[in-house]
From Swiss-Prot:
Misc remark: During catalysis, the active site Cys acts as a nucleophile attacking the alpha-carbonyl group of tRNA-bound glutamate with the formation of a thioester intermediate between enzyme and glutamate, and the concomitant release of tRNA(Glu). The thioester intermediate is finally reduced by direct hydride transfer from NADPH, to form the product GSA.
GO biological-process terms attached to the record: protoporphyrinogen IX biosynthetic process from glutamate
Keywords assigned by UniProt, alphabetized: NADP, Oxidoreductase, Porphyrin biosynthesis
Record remark on domains: Possesses an unusual extended V-shaped dimeric structure with each monomer consisting of three distinct domains arranged along a curved 'spinal' alpha-helix. The N-terminal catalytic domain specifically recognizes the glutamate moiety of the substrate. The second domain is the NADPH-binding domain, and the third C-terminal domain is responsible for dimerization.
Pfam assignment, any one: GlutR_dimer
Biological role: Catalyzes the NADPH-dependent reduction of glutamyl-tRNA(Glu) to glutamate 1-semialdehyde (GSA).
Protein name per UniProt: Glutamyl-tRNA reductase
Organism in which the protein naturally occurs: Oceanobacillus iheyensis (strain DSM 14371 / CIP 107618 / JCM 11309 / KCTC 3954 / HTE831)
Gene Ontology molecular function: any one: glutamyl-tRNA reductase activity
Reaction catalysed by this enzyme: (S)-4-amino-5-oxopentanoate + tRNA(Glu) + NADP(+) = L-glutamyl-tRNA(Glu) + NADPH + H(+)
Annotated site residues (Important for activity) in this chain: 99
Coiled-coil blocks: none
HAMAP family: Glu_tRNA_reductase (MF_00087)
Length: 457
């Protein structure tokens, strides 16, 4: 058994190629089911976002797994393999696990440490569970990756430092004013940067937002998204008198807010502090405005310094997470090693309980007049004896599973307790339940296909 990651992402694949391999929400579950029906594919989860399309699969053989995943992509999207193979990035076993942990923590994201991808990984996993394309291995691996993603963000605070200009502006406003809920925020300009600033402002709790723009049609369109008010640019002096914060990104060729305009505004404000953020290039605001009392002006260069410092903080946090990822991989591989012992322990318990049940039947034949209470007491105590006798052998079996010669040790364990047939039955039951293990032929010697085929180097 092996774990594969096959896919495209923003690092290696241009958007004009990525967009051809994006699974729609409506088709994603059908795609996972279709993939699982391919030869060699035992479990699968597909993560499809604007920045990546990645297939994670448990396969019985690496070369056939790679082949059938490529063939699936070709068939599903109607594109010849030769046209996209150069863009595909494939990682195996430890590399695939590491990549998933990096994705879930935001280390592989365009914006280092962003949290949106963790929700997307979780949703992909839930989608796969709903259509039964995961089994024993991915149920454990994805739960671990999602839990680790949450823990990594909590322990390192990697996502707490703004690394975009518009978000840095909002963070700076929060440092100056604290709670933004009661503050009046004006957005000058209804372009892309203005909309992003409005989104971040609203996400930080601001409820009173005014969009100011030359073209009212564009302003109205943006305002609808954020339940904001709209004013034309000729009302800018009035808005400046009322607002606590102004974020400007008009794209104008010349200064929009002059020092002279602000001097008049400040007389009307009667000393109330005004926070101005100019993220436009060329600048919208006269730099001389910063000379005015109780006016705090920041331009894109000021914010870039904040972003650079924050990005460095995120990089330091990322280094800590990289070390934690190594520990997570070790933890998962240790779990994999114990997986092979489950059918052995189950078989041993089943044989012991069968003996206990036969013993109870023998007692009842020899002592037919047992009361219900006596029968319950005997049943309870004979099971207690079984559990006490099995405690040490079960512990030993688990220890065997963690050793390099696990398969030989477990086979010896099986022979000693005479549970060969019971183990075969447990392996078949396990395979049917999880649809992960290869079919076990009744005449074949019992084996532990999961633990030995995953690379442990």
């Amino acid at each position: 058994m092996h774990i594969l990651k096959v896919g495209f992402n923003y690092k290696t694949t241009p958007v004009d190629i990525r967009e051809k391999f994006t699974f729609s929400e409506d088709s994603l579950q059908d795609a996972m089911v279709e993939l699982k029906n391919q030869k060699s594919i035992l479990e699968d989860v597909i993560i499809s976002t604007c920045n990546r399309t990645e297939i994670y699969a448990v396969v019985d053989q690496l070369h056939t797994g790679r082949y059938y995943i490529k063939q699936f992509l070709s068939n599903w999207f109607g594109i010849e393999k030769e046209e996209f193979s150069t863009y595909l990035r494939i990682t195996e076993d430890d590399g695939a696990m590491e990549h998933l942990f990096r994705v879930s923590t935001g280390l592989d994201s365009m914006v280092l440490g962003e949290t949106q991808i963790l929700g997307q990984v979780k949703q992909a996993f839930l989608n796969s569970q709903q259509v039964n394309t995961t089994g024993t291995i991915f149920n454990e691996l994805f739960k671990q990756a999602i839990t680790f993603g949450k823990r990594a963000h909590k322990e390192t605070a990697i996502g707490e430092h703004a690394v975009s200009i518009s978000y840095a502006a909002v963070e700076l406003a929060k440092k100056i004013f604290g709670d933004l809920q009661e503050k009046h925020v004006a957005i000058l300009g209804a372009g892309k940067m203005g909309e992003l600033a409005a989104k971040n402002i609203q996400g930080s709790g601001a409820t009173k937002i005014t969009v100011v723009n030359r073209t009212l049609e564009n302003a109205n369109e943006m305002a609808e998204k954020f339940n904001a008010d709209v004013e034309s640019i000729d009302q800018l002096p009035v808005i400046l008198q009322q607002a606590d914060i102004l974020i400007s990104s008009t794209g104008a060729d010349s200064i929009v807010v002059t020092k002279e305009m602000m001097e008049k505004v400040q007389k009307q404000r009667k000393g109330r502090a005004l926070f101005l953020v100019d993220i436009a290039v060329p600048r919208d605001m006269d730099p001389a405005i910063s000379e005015l009392e109780n006016v705090f002006l920041y331009d894109i260069d000021n914010l870039q310094h904040i972003v650079d410092d924050n990005l460095e903080s995120r990089k330091q946090a990322a280094e800590k997470i990289e070390l934690l990822i190594e520990e997570e991989i070790v933890t998962f591989k240790e779990w994999l090693k114990t997986l092979g012992v489950i059918p052995v322990i189950s078989a041993l318990r089943q044989k012991a309980l069968t003996i206990q049940a036969e013993t109870m039947q023998s007692i009842e034949r020899k002592i037919p007049n047992l009361t219900d209470r006596e029968r319950k007491v005997l049943n309870k105590h004979t099971k207690s004896i079984i559990n006490q006798l099995l405690k040490e052998p079960v512990t030993q079996a688990k220890e065997f599973a963690g050793k390099d010669n696990a398969e030989d040790s477990l086979q010896l364990f099986i022979n000693i307790f005479g549970i060969e047939e019971e183990v075969k039955e447990e392996l078949v039951k396990h395979a049917k339940k999880n649809e992960t293990l290869m079919k076990i032929a009744k005449e074949e010697p019992s084996s532990f296909p999961i633990i030995e085929k995953i690379t442990t180097a």
